[in-house]
Amino acid sequence: MVLCGFCAGFACVFGAPIAGALFGIEILAVGVILYDVLLPAFVASLTAYQVSSALGITFFYYPLHFVPAFEQGFFLRLLAGGMFFGWLAYLLIGTIQRSTALTTAIPIWRPLKGLLGGGLLVALTLVFGRDYLGLGLNLMEGCIKGDSVLPYAFLLKALFTIITLSISRSGSVITPILFIGATAGSFFGRLTGADTGTFAAIGFVSVLAGATNTPIATSILAIELFGADVAPYAAVSCVISFLMSGHRSLYASQVLTISKSRGLEPELGEEIQHINTVSRPVRFNMMTRLRSWWHGRTRL
């Protein structure tokens, strides 16, 4: 029931029933798809979406009418973008965890701590404006349209989000992550001379993929929100971001069932918040790989 509620909520908020069902399934465990919950997840997600639509709720939907043609220069930018978004997700998770631990350790009365955190947010709002409060849908839509935004907008939203979560220790993280991804994508597109709208859409889903370990759901989310033209590029970037973000997650109760790197040995089968990762040297021996491949063929 909890899973169905999660899938339904995602579908209602973002207007993405397929991605909602897959997101709820992927969020349970990293590296495993539980097929026995596919049907209830999809039923809950699709039903919630249809009910919301019947009630007249409008969703964030902006199909991209211009996507750069596939060529070598764009593909290299795409690879670099995926690494940038994964690195950003990695840093964001670590910063939220450390700031939460720090504020928890400060021996201050909790209501007073909330008052101080709220005062800090008000001060930042007076300096930088209200764009970084709330959902920020207008700014996200502007990024995807190719409008100019502050190059450090994603850092400001990250700061607002970190302060809020570290003080309150609760609150939505998905929409702020999407905001950070869209503005970071716009910044990356401008930095590399690429189309800012396209990379805003790619960053929108890629940072979420890295921060929550959900590359399949976020690839589908790109199709449902931005159209099929961006699908192959978004999928590549989401997978790279997923690999680059390491064995971390905004959802610390995710169960890790795979290692993302041959050079790391995490404790598999444990929740991410409880694992310890050990580095190991990676030796690539071509002859050993060829012998393993040949022995595998001879067994068939």
Predicted segments, located by residue:
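Alpha-helical transmembrane segments and immediately membrane-proximal extracytoplasmic
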Residues: 1-300
